[in-house]
Amino acid sequence: TVIGYTGTKGKTTSVYFTRHVMAKALGKVVAQLSSIDECLDGETFIPAHLTTPESLDLFRMMKEAVDNQMKYLVMEVSSQAYKKSRVFGLPLDIGVFLNISPDHISPVEHPSFEDYLACKSEIIDNCRILVVNRECSQYDYLAEKAHDLGKQVISFGSDQSAADYQYRLGEHGHFTVTTANPALP
């Protein structure tokens, strides 16, 4: 099972959080690829060089994780990963779109917001299930694209009337997640 996160902000934190929760629940069977480090055996973390590794490195790392009996991979998927075909041919079981803002518009990265959005939204083409922030400025576009491609869409957000899953932040880092639809996974 491969879970990929994209977003201008929050990819690394979300990957760490997800891997930690999954490892607590499932044991040492969760690999991680992030901009900070990589874990291919469920225990050992080594420094990373890119947010998303180059294609050949990525697939080599995935093979190593499988050889190490990893059943899950939680990873960051940057806009550059799609722009430079680093994740070409990589299907995601779950793609998570956190947010988008014009931080990476430049001659070096993306010439326009439209190019940036197009690259980031490729996660929809490559995932089976899209989990998307209901409060993302491009939510309607992303959800429509996913529905047009026949993808399941699950939303999250703090607005209880709009998202499938709602969160409420408490004190000291505590939070509560609720859903009005018990049929959702």
Question: Would you name each region that the model predicts?
Answer:
Residues 1-130, 134, 138-151:
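Phosphate-binding loop of NTP-binding sites
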Residues 47-49, 110, 162-177:
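Short, surface-exposed amphipathic charged segments that create phosphate/polyanion-binding patches used
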Residues 88, 171-185:
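Nucleotide phosphate-binding/pyrophosphate-handling subdomain across enzymes
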Residues 147-170:
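Beta-strand->loop->alpha-helix junctions that form or flank phosphate-binding loops
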